Regions:
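Conserved catalytic or regulatory cores that recognize and/or transform ribose-phosphate-containing ligands
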Residues: 1-206
Length: 206
């Protein structure tokens, strides 16, 4: 049996989770995964990966987390959230050094499809070549903003899709974060198709 080879490109699909409907959470990610499916591209969808870490169906894992919070089960809540964000990494780990180490591991060893089941969302972003952020202005989200910060700290390119507003009407800090990652360029799209076209061109996916 041949050894599994690293995948050329890796991306992370960021967007609303907790304050959107299950359909809204899943649909845009499935669309991206279908349109960008390619042997040279590894796509990390946090919906499926987070759900597997808490033993729930994709999309339903949000209710599981909310139930722990509303029931006052804070210790279990923390354990589940740590699992979602950091996988099996020790909770006492220096997170700054962790990010540096994970980024170096991506550059030295590459990423393989079989590995992503053990990644938390933090590792998935840090080990990405670029991330895709779907961010309607009406959506309330915090986790997505975490992911944008992780990306721009490591200068990981960000493709931002804002379907309901032009860049001039989008959140200023969000736009600025993408500029940090994109060498000051504005890489903001109004539609998924526009974003997909640009990703395919940049990564030479045919």
């Amino acid at each position: 049996m041949s050894e599994e080879q690293p995948i050329k490109w890796t991306t992370y699909l960021a967007g609303g989770m907790e304050n959107v409907s299950k359909k809204e959470m899943i649909d845009f990610r499935e669309t991206f995964m279908k349109k960008l499916q390619h042997e040279d591209l590894l796509i990390y969808s946090p919906v499926a990966q987070e759900a597997s870490k808490v033993g729930a169906n994709p999309g339903d894992h949000i209710k599981h987390i909310q139930g722990l919070k509303r029931g006052g089960h804070w210790d279990i809540f923390f354990e589940r959230m740590w699992k979602i964000w950091f996988g099996n990494i020790n909770q006492n780990t220096d997170l700054i050094q962790l990010g540096i180490n994970l980024r170096m591991r991506k550059h030295i060893d590459g990423n393989r499809r079989s590995e992503i089941v053990s990644w938390g969302d933090f590792e998935a972003v840090i080990r990405s070549d670029f991330i895709i952020v779907y961010h309607p202005t009406s959506i309330k989200t915090v986790g997505t903003h975490f992911e944008v910060v992780f990306a721009f700290l490591f200068r990981i390119p960000i493709y931002l899709v804002v379907p309901d507003a032009p860049p001039t009407e989008s959140n200023s800090s969000l736009i600025f974060g993408t500029q940090i990652s994109n060498n000051k360029a504005i890489r903001v799209f109004r539609t998924i198709n526009e974003c997909v076209t640009q990703v395919k061109a940049d990564c030479k996916l045919k």
